[in-house]
Amino acid sequence: GISAEVTSRAEKGFYRVKYELQDKPLVSVIIPTKDHIEDLDKCLQSLEKVNTYDNMEYIIVENNSEKEETFEYYDRIQKEIPKAKVVYWKEQGFNYPSINNMGVDNSKGEYLLFLNNDTEIVNPDCISELLSQCQRSEVGAVGARLYYEDGTIQHAGVIIGMGGVAGHAFVGFEHDDLGYFARIVLVQDYSAVTAACMMVKRNVFEEVGRFDEGYAVAFNDVDLCLKIREAGYLIVYDPYAELNHYESKSRGYEDTEEKVARFNSEVDRFQKRWKDVLQKGDPFYSPNLTLDKN
């Protein structure tokens, strides 16, 4: 009774299940941004010109931009792309969960796509692919395969416990690598995926209490995924949804004393909240493999 097509991959013994879209619901794309309009424009143009799924709205969440050209761009892009809407997060500092939660408040879609402003869609059916997985009744959230600018792997799922908290799997692997047991290229369940590109059912997002604003920068997406799993839903990694991710351009890196202190407090918060999960180990990662590096 499942509408799907099963095809074999070139590698012997591996298959792909391609689910048919049940319908074409509205997808709300939530894009936090601060200046760096070149990156934002590249992201939006890929949504408009590369992506083929059309029932979408773009909620651009402006947070503390400083350049006049940024606001001129907002005026222009909302005229050029009617489905784009700029909303203003007016608090001080940076709080990724708060920014995204506000974006959701200003959206209407049945499905939410959290998308970094420094991403760019690679394959035309990227959004359709994410949606086809997210429409499955047992699935709560779906993540994509992300590449660095040089084409190497930036994200192919998240491993709980890596580095003491959580880390991306297969970072730095070559673009066409299969990975351990072909995990880079196969659709599968994970404990978490990155919110640099993550689709979530709206009702599930609300059911689990949204993003926890206590994680201003780090681990908010992992925390959300674990709450979704705790509620009984699956987290799916879909390598057939591909994007480039020009990581951390608009926010910067953890390179000041204040940022390091904030990061350490978020590590502590995560380790206390998910102590049992960390002790038991990630059910989607072999206990025989190291957590010291990916």
Give residue ranges: language-model regions:
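A short, conserved alpha-helix in the catalytic core of glycosyltransferases
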Residues: 1, 126-130, 184-209, 213-244
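Cell-envelope/extracellular polymer assembly enzymes that use nucleotide-activated donors
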Residues: 25-30, 57, 223
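A conserved hydrophobic helix/loop-capping motif in glycosyltransferases and polysaccharide synthases
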Residues: 28-39, 43, 50-51, 61-63, ...
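Acidic donor-binding segment of Leloir-type glycosyltransferases
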Residues: 48-92
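Glycine-rich, basic loop-to-helix element that forms the pyrophosphate-binding segment
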Residues: 89-107
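C-terminal, non-catalytic tails of nucleotide-sugar-dependent glycosyltransferases
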Residues: 1-27, 150-151, 162-189, 235, ...
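Short aromatic/hydrophobic "clamp" motif used to bind/position activated sugar donors
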Residues: 112
